Design a protein with these regions (language model features):
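Structure-specific DNA junction-binding interface
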Residues: 1-100
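C-terminal accessory module of base-excision DNA glycosylases/AP lyases that mediates lesion recognition
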Residues: 1-31, 35, 105-115, 125-223
């Protein structure tokens, strides 16, 4: 359902206050389905990370780069099969021991998702279709993985979208001055992107970067 005019107008006013030029979306992994999957899962409730003086990275970015180096020797056509065949416990030592919920590590969720995609012959970025219900179900069918990170997974493969995470939702809530769900926040950002004639991914990243760096200190709190 379309947002009300008042909500969309308020959101557009808030977006107009974001300093320009907007921070550019850093891009994802258009040629690496395995890295997109690792990033999507490792980013759940985890900071993106920052570069250390030695060139290594902390956070989710660091985990992805470690796995990239670890799997560098694998032939491109075998990347997803290699990920699906990983021992989750061994993979934890490369990534980290964070969990998607109390009973499952992120490494375990990554391997399970890779196995599910492998079972339906989705092994390369070109095979994945964001609007395919079966493809979505293979991802969200893994306990701990949901629709928000599914959309982020597809964004990392160069498909347009919005990852309606905590910062996106909070920005929208502050803009419209009421509580909203992740689904509603994502829909509003998409409507705003359409109104502004920009890619959804571009607006998503601009809002996320602004919200996460300013902690929304200049925006009015919910009354």
């Amino acid at each position: 359902m379309s947002a009300t005019i008042s909500d969309l107008d308020r959101l557009l006013v808030a977006i107009a206050a974001i300093p320009t030029p907007w921070k550019e979306w850093p891009g994802g992994y258009p040629g690496r389905l395995d890295l997109a999957l690792v990033d999507a899962v490792m980013s759940i409730r985890f900071r993106y990370g920052r570069e250390r003086k030695d060139g290594s990275w902390t956070g989710a970015r660091g985990a992805v780069l470690r796995y990239q180096a670890y799997s560098d020797h694998v032939a491109p056509a075998e990347k997803m099969k290699n990920l699906a065949n990983q021992d989750p416990i061994a993979l934890e030592r490369i990534l980290n021991r964070q969990k998607v919920h109390s009973g499952k590590t992120k490494a375990c969720a990554i391997v399970e998702a890779a196995q599910r995609f492998l079972a339906i012959d989705v092994t390369e970025p070109a095979h994945l279709r964001p609007d395919d219900a079966e493809h979505r179900a293979q991802y969200t069918g893994v306990s701990g993985l949901g629709p928000v990170t599914w959309e982020y997974f597809t964004m990392l493969l160069s498909h347009d979208g919005v990852k309606a995470d905590t910062w996106i939702r909070r920005f929208v809530e502050r803009s419209v001055q009421r509580n909203v769900s992740s689904d509603e926040a994502g829909a509003l950002i998409k409507e705003a992107a359409n109104k502004l004639d920009v890619r959804e991914t571009k607006l998503d990243y601009a809002v996320w970067n602004y919200a996460s760096t300013t902690r929304l200190e200049t925006m009015p709190k919910l009354s």
